[in-house]
UniProtKB/Swiss-Prot annotation:
To P.anserina SMR1. This is Mating-type protein A-2. Residues 1-22 are annotated as: Disordered. InterPro entries: MAT1-1-2/MatA-2/Smr1 (IPR031472). Transmembrane segments: none annotated.
Length: 373
């Protein structure tokens, strides 16, 4: 046997190592390529959404500043930690907060809808830009929480009864557009173990349109021990209407001159209300200032009544249409505001100042960016 001419037998183990090394290198190359593709897609998305992103960032900075001012005006302990002795501190502007929040909602809807389109139609996770999607979503939720605090629960802070020494949550409560009053007796009822009830229209707690004369006419005596009621009152024991349903009044002649104008305006608003109806939009779709958001959320929760952090229980007042608006909350609002269409968030903010019990989530038509009041 010629040992010199014999070739050594190759081992199979180095070959396996080489294959594993090659596959590992190939996987790393694919991962790098995917990262570059995602970066390119994110750049492309941000270039398309540049105006919306710029508007969102500017308004979010403005909203953070306004939220700080609002907190400092409510709790003085935040003033020194955030503003120190500088002259930057000033008074908060509720109107500016509402308009800025509405602008944030509009710009974030544009961003989130575009990223959602890329995710559904191109198969890109988070639309190719997860950081942008999270920033837009959390900024939008922050704007919603501020709006909810300033609008939905505004009446809870200004609920009637303070002049009588009544405490909100203990003696008076607002629920579904009605002012609930707790009786002095310890009677077990349906709300909080107390006898919560809606007072008669003549009660000082009740709000009726116009002046106190409405309450006088509400129990106008027409003879034969019968009363004429101008307001429906389901809470009253004798709410069933009996006797004459009309009485005579003197109307100034000047009212006839504005009849046509008022009628045409009423018809225009009624047409808008009928044609558009009450569109129920989808819930807000699923933003980097995490620490600031958490800090502001905590401060708002402990300082402002009605500010509800995401995930906490809350009372939601639903906008159910003109015909179902209770008489208590039909005052101090032009009828044209209750059913109108605006196409800009600034105008929507103007309307929200009057609609104290309107859920902003019910006013955003995300795809068309039309706001219904």
């Amino acid at each position: 046997m010629n040992l010199l001419n014999m070739q050594p037998k190759r081992s199979e183990q180095p070959a396996m190592f080489e294959e594993n090394r090659a596959s590992s290198q190939e996987g790393q190359d694919l991962e790098v390529m995917y990262k570059k593709l995602h970066q390119l897609q994110a750049r492309l998305s941000r270039s398309v959404l540049s105006e919306a992103i710029k508007e969102f960032e500017e308004n979010l900075r403005c909203l953070f500043h306004e939220a700080k001012l609002l907190l400092c005006s409510t709790r003085t302990k935040y003033r020194q930690s955030w503003f120190g002795s500088s002259n930057e501190f000033g008074s908060s502007d509720e109107r500016r907060i509402i308009k800025t929040s509405c602008c944030i909602i509009e710009s974030t809807n544009t961003i989130l809808n575009f990223l959602s389109f890329l995710e559904k139609n191109r198969g890109l996770p988070f639309g190719g830009d997860q950081r942008l999607q999270q920033a837009a979503y959390k900024g939008q939720q922050f704007a919603f929480r501020l709006l909810r605090s300033l609008t939905l629960h505004k009446a809870a802070q200004e609920v009637p009864g303070k002049d009588f020494g009544l405490v909100y949550g203990k003696d008076v409560y607002v629920l579904n557009g009605h002012i609930l009053h707790r009786s002095k007796q310890e009677i077990v009822g349906q709300a909080g173990g107390r006898n919560w009830h809606v007072d008669h229209t003549l009660h000082p707690l009740r709000r009726v349109p116009g002046t106190p004369w409405h309450k006088f006419f509400g129990n106008l005596e027409v003879g034969d021990d019968k009363q004429l009621r101008l307001f429906d009152d389901d809470a009253a024991v004798d709410s069933y209407r009996v006797g004459p349903q009309k009485f005579f009044v003197v109307i100034p002649e000047t009212a006839e001159f504005i009849l046509d104008e008022v009628s045409s305006e009423h018809q225009r608003v009624a047409t808008i209300h009928t044609e558009n109806g009450h569109v129920q939009p989808p819930a807000p779709t699923s933003i980097q200032q995490e620490a600031l958001l958490r800090k502001l959320d905590f401060a708002m929760t402990t300082s402002l009544p009605g500010y509800v952090v995401e995930g906490q229980p809350e009372i939601v007042f639903h906008h159910e249409g003109l015909r179902q608006i209770p008489v208590d909350y039909s005052q101090e609002r032009p009828l044209s505001i209750l059913s109108h269409v605006f196409t800009r968030p600034a105008l929507w903010g103007e309307g929200l100042e009057l609609a104290d019990h309107f859920d902003p989530r019910d006013g955003v038509q995300q795809e068309e960016h039309i706001y219904y009041i």
